[in-house]
Amino acid sequence: EAPGIGIACIVAQSFGVPVVFAKKSQSKNIAGEVYSSKVESYTHGRIFDIIVSKKFLGPEDKILIIDDFMANGAAMDGLLEVIKESGAQVVGAGIIIEKGFQGGGERLRSQGLRVESLAIVDEMNDKTGEIVFRDDK
């Protein structure tokens, strides 16, 4: 949730559009009706609800999803479910680092979602610490 917000703010400022972010739990600053979806976090190994207030998302909105990391795409699936429930239109997703070896980006692209990543990691070696980026092959 928090690491992607700064990046989303920069992108929104560049495009001159507002930022809406999903929370991973109900909090005091989200009042009223919400859209929600259950998401299993690969990184944290647990299931949580992502929540967006209905007052910030509706059928007239066009959404560019911005996130810092993508692994298997489960978080993106949850966001897509929330956006679909709202009636808004997803125009694409911008990812800072995609873990290509976990397949989320390719799966979402094959479903027709435009996904653009600044860097795609194809291999990570736990023993040597070596990271292989897609363009390095």
Language-model region placement:
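Short Gly/Thr/Asp-enriched flexible loops that form oxyanion-binding sites at enzyme active sites
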Residues: 6-15, 80
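Short, flexible, glycine/charge-rich loop motifs used to bind or transfer phosphoryl groups or to couple energy/partner
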Residues: 10, 52-55, 105
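PRPP-dependent phosphoribosyltransferase catalytic core
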Residues: 78-137
